[in-house]
Amino acid sequence: MSIGKIKESDLCKSLAVFMEEVYKDCELYYEVKTIRDRKIDCVCKTKDGETIAIEMKLHANLTVLYQAFNNLECCNYSMILIPAGCLRDFSRSFIKTLCLKLGIGLLLIDRYNKVTLETCMTKNENPSNAGYVKLFEQQKNFVGGEASSACWSEYSQTIYEITNWLKEHESGNLTDILKQINHHYSSVSNGKQAIMRYIKRGILKQFEIVDLDGIIKLKKEE
């Protein structure tokens, strides 16, 4: 593995292998949105329900450590994964010491794609902002570490569920649809108004309005 050519997205596969070996039957979610529109490269949910935030970077610096430390506000544990080759001898001990003091797990990946845990993690029993971390099935298919990757939000999930509902029913009134799905709006009426407004503005291009009372359907693919 060439350090000069490796990308953050290349770290995903090796991370997945390591996490499955250590945490059997865990689930990995990528590009997870959290508080203040920050996002975590990867969140691992163990079969016991604990969460581990992992930042995958090509270099170790104070910014990465700051991100990882902040992730403890949202998850039970926090790690960083970096290539072993990016650390010089003098900085390796420095980074390890900082990780130990901050309670952050340091994962190093070598040229053979093997991942090792260099420092132990400190558990945060009750992350103050855990409620801001929303994990959706779709995030399992994202590519962690890609700057262009969009976060899957509660809004994304709502639109996804509306789309699936319309695929089964062809058309329907938004009031009825929102009553039958999980959505993030404070009320059905607020959700209906917002979605109708987005359709009219062309933001939700996959839907079209059948009736101004709130009946919508999926646009046919051209």
Task: Give the label of every model feature segment.
Residues 98-217, 221-222:
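Non-catalytic C-terminal interaction segments of nucleic acid-processing enzymes
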